[in-house]
């Protein structure tokens, strides 16, 4: 068969060459090989010890870390360098009378050692702050477990909450931790779940009345939901205030983390 010659203009021939055979401009090379990295939200996670009855609820802290990781956040973990209110033997649910522990040292267990004194946390260096629950929030970060509506909040915790709120940076809280925002941020909207026990499904339903007594607005939400106070940029979810399957709690925390990250704008 006779060969067929196809006449192609030099300009068209250049266009038909594979990319690897053509000269590229700097901007073309950049567009092909890379893209501008998306800024990562810097999130401070504030712990209150290690263990549901006298510190941080470990499952909540872990769920928060998983969802922050999935959301691409850069996480820094903090805790106050103060003694725990007391130590609970978690096999019995009773105080260990002769034992004392430090909140920062205990929180380091969850942080795998990568933790900083809360006194060094600055809102200027972070885009958001998140507080897991566990009774440590009501015993070590505040005196809510003992004093209810007349409670005091740890001075560093109060400072951090006021700094982030004043800078209009989002704050996430779950389980019992929303009482901290209720005490510090006037008129804030939070949820601790439902307001009736409903046959034991919501064993801490009475906390809703305490939230109201602190001057906050309580918003009823299910365990898989998060409430967003758009004005104050405070996001809350019930977590273990509800007796339910772990994956429901995990989903609710995911909703909270997602909203917090959205509010950072990153």
UniProtKB/Swiss-Prot annotation:
InterPro entries: Class_I_gatase-like. One of its GO terms (cellular component) is mitochondrion. The modification N6-succinyllysine is found at residues 201, 221, 231. PANTHER family: ES1 PROTEIN HOMOLOG, MITOCHONDRIAL (PTHR10224), GLUTAMINE AMIDOTRANSFERASE-LIKE CLASS 1 DOMAIN-CONTAINING PROTEIN 3, MITOCHONDRIAL-RELATED (PTHR10224:SF9). The keyword Transit peptide applies. Its main location: mitochondrion. By 2D-PAGE, the determined pI of this protein (spot P2) is: 8.9, its MW is: 25 kDa. The keyword ATP-binding does not apply. This is ES1 protein homolog, mitochondrial. It comes from the Eukaryota. It comes from Rattus norvegicus.
